[in-house]
Amino acid sequence: MRSQSEGRPSEARSRLLDTATRLFYAEGIHAVGIDRIVAEAQVTRATLYRHFPGKEDLVLAYLNEVDRAMRSQADEAIAAGLPAADTIRALSRSIAQGIRSPGFRGCAFLNAAAEYPAPESPVRKAVLAHRQWFLDTVTDLLAKIRQTDAEPAARDFVMMRDGAMAAGCLFDPALICETFLRGVERLLQVHAATDIGPAWA
């Protein structure tokens, strides 16, 4: 019989995922064991394995939740109906806000990729799928400004975003965000122009 503290299965699953998300992001995936997740989520190991057959399944669920949150954030910005450049600015401000938030520990996907380097790893594949979605989203927005060189400009944006998120947990977040947002403005100006050369010129 399931204990009252575990609640309904959906509640137990939510507690497990919430606990894993908090610990994986703050301390690293490999650094956090199943026993600790079970203890802090206040469920049994049997309950965990009923919802997540293995730790990797829990890791994938964690990344899926982060992915869903970011897609929702992007969808909300796009749905506002602003010009494409302003939508990119809104996404950039949201990224900067995350970097400035307490407990920021970098990009969850880049962190996971560092812990799962094998190309055949399902976790690695989930990271790459998320990054491809993000690149495609930015490419589509930049193509609305100017079709030519939209994908190279999007790669520039993603690289700036990666750099800002990596540096944001090492140095002054305010300065990192200021630098990132200034770089985004420069990229938008260069991309909107014609025959001006690459964004780094």
Task: Give the location of each predicted region.
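Cytochrome P450 catalytic-core helices
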Residues: 161
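C-terminal peripheral helix-coil segments that are non-catalytic and often amphipathic
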Residues: 1-6, 129-148, 167-201
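Basic, helix-initiating cap at the start of DNA-binding domains
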Residues: 1-27, 31-43, 56-60
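Short hydrophobic/aromatic patch on the recognition helix
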Residues: 42-52
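Short, basic, alpha-helical segments at the C-terminal edge of helix-turn-helix-like DNA-binding modules
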Residues: 64-70
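Hydrophobic alpha-helical connector segments
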Residues: 61, 75-103, 144, 154-157
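Amphipathic alpha-helical packing segments from all-alpha helical-bundle domains
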Residues: 71, 86-89, 119-144, 155, ...
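Amphipathic alpha-helical segments used for helix-helix packing
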Residues: 101-121
